[in-house]
From Swiss-Prot:
Post-translational modification as stated in the protein's UniProt record: Is synthesized initially as an inactive proenzyme. Formation of the active enzyme involves a self-maturation process in which the active site pyruvoyl group is generated from an internal serine residue via an autocatalytic post-translational modification. Two non-identical subunits are generated from the proenzyme in this reaction, and the pyruvate is formed at the N-terminus of the alpha chain, which is derived from the carboxyl end of the proenzyme.
Catalyzed reactions per annotation: a 1,2-diacyl-sn-glycero-3-phospho-L-serine + H(+) = a 1,2-diacyl-sn-glycero-3-phosphoethanolamine + CO2
Cofactor: pyruvate
Family of this protein: Belongs to the phosphatidylserine decarboxylase family. PSD-A subfamily.
EC supergroup of this enzyme: lyase
Protein name, entry field: Phosphatidylserine decarboxylase proenzyme
Length: 232
């Protein structure tokens, strides 16, 4: 086993998006330390925090087209019916929406909840309200991704918040995504909304902890027991 493999297997991986910021914090730490020794250690604490912020642990994703997997780490903050953002072109009828709120300590990498092809990616500028507020879905800055999945179109919306003011999405229209594949991140937390067809059965409840790429939010199967939440 090589040294690189040993490091990779011993420590939590860091996403490449974080490399410039980690390097920047480290260089600033060296400069501050040259001016005054205690400042070096303060800078190193911030560098370690930056490393923690951009951690990107591997996940074991269920490979089942009947499942919808959480796109984000965090807490389920909403389960119910809601009209999807207009830019997704999903119509004006309410759809099942599951929202996952990410705090500043969550893993910030976002993963595709389903396998499918991206129909469109639309970025909308907006406000930076508390992402836990319901109106943040329509008023805050957001990035909307429409995916054509084996069970139809679903919407995945990355929403900025009070602290999170930088949404990153490196996937583009016509890209093919695997379930659990990384497609973006939101710096300093915030929220991700998933809009599902009405025939999806929700398997999570408000307040439940979700793990990106692993937690089952909903499914289309008929033999998986009673749903956690019925959407009427």
């Amino acid at each position: 086993m090589s040294l690189t493999d040993t490091i990779r297997n011993t420590f939590v991986p860091i996403h490449r998006e974080g490399y410039p910021f980690i390097a920047g914090f480290f260089v600033v730490s060296l400069i501050l330390g040259w001016l005054w020794d205690p400042l070096f250690w303060i800078g190193m604490v911030l560098t370690v925090w930056c490393i923690y912020f951009y951690r990107d642990p591997e996940r074991v994703t269920p490979m089942d087209d009947d499942l919808v997997i959480s796109p984000a780490d965090g807490k389920v903050s909403f389960v119910g019916l809601a009209v999807p953002p207009a830019e997704l072109d999903l119509g004006y009828e309410p759809m099942t929406r599951v929202s996952v709120f990410m705090n500043v300590f969550s893993v910030h990498i976002n993963r595709s909840p389903v396998r499918g092809k991206i129909d469109k990616v639309v970025h909308r500028p907006g406000k930076f309200l508390n992402a836990e507020l319901d109106k943040a879905s329509t008023e805050n800055e957001r990035n909307s991704v429409l995916i054509e999945s084996p069970h139809g179109k679903i919407g995945v919306v990355q929403i900025a918040g009070l602290v999170a003011r930088r949404i990153v999405c490196w996937s583009n229209q016509d890209d093919e995504l695997s379930v659990g594949e990384r497609f973006g991140l939101i710096r300093f937390g915030s929220r991700v909304d998933v809009y599902l067809p009405s025939d999806a059965t929700v398997r999570v409840a408000v307040g439940q902890t979700a793990i990106a790429g692993e937690t089952v939010l909903a499914d289309y199967g008929t033999e998986r027991g009673e749903p956690v939440v019925r959407i009427a």
